[in-house]
């Protein structure tokens, strides 16, 4: 699997911003089939940083209603990546 297929997008929320500032931990939406080793290698290769730890979680999609029609958002996988001390990814600045 290509490293750019593994990492889909950063998850920018209030909680993830606090985790970044306090624990040097970033959150990404990743491919559901990717494992922790593949995620760590992809982050290291794309952003040229050292990854210490990867924690993953599968997020269930919410049920949404539009009128009579009931639909469901897709399930997705979230990866919380802890970077080495001193390492940082710049595109999160100012977000």
Curated annotation (Swiss-Prot):
Record-linked Pfam families: Ribosomal_L23
The UniProt record lists the keyword Ribonucleoprotein: yes
GO biological process terms held by the UniProt record: translation
Matching InterPro entries: Nucleotide-bd_a/b_plait_sf, Ribosomal_uL23-like, Ribosomal_uL23/eL15/eS24_sf
One GO term describing the cellular component: ribosome
Molecular-function GO term, any one: rRNA binding
This protein's UniProt keywords: Ribonucleoprotein, Ribosomal protein, RNA-binding, rRNA-binding
Function, as annotated: One of the early assembly proteins it binds 23S rRNA. One of the proteins that surrounds the polypeptide exit tunnel on the outside of the ribosome. Forms the main docking site for trigger factor binding to the ribosome.
Matches recorded under PANTHER family: 60S RIBOSOMAL PROTEIN L23A (PTHR11620)
Record's subunit section: Part of the 50S ribosomal subunit. Contacts protein L29, and trigger factor when it is bound to the ribosome.
Protein family (similarity comment): Belongs to the universal ribosomal protein uL23 family.
Protein name stated in the entry: Large ribosomal subunit protein uL23
Taxonomic classification: Bacteria, Pseudomonadati, Thermodesulfobacteriota, Desulfobacteria, Desulfobacterales
């Amino acid at each position: 699997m290509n490293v750019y297929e593994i990492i889909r997008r950063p998850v920018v929320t209030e909680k993830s911003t606090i985790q970044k500032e306090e624990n040097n931990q970033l959150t990404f939406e990743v491919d559901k089939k990717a494992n922790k080793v593949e995620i760590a290698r992809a982050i290291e290769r794309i952003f040229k940083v050292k990854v210490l730890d990867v924690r993953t979680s599968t997020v269930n999609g919410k049920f949404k209603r539009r009128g009579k029609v009931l639909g469901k958002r897709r399930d997705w996988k979230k990866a919380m990546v802890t970077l080495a001390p001193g390492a940082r990814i710049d595109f999160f600045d100012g977000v």
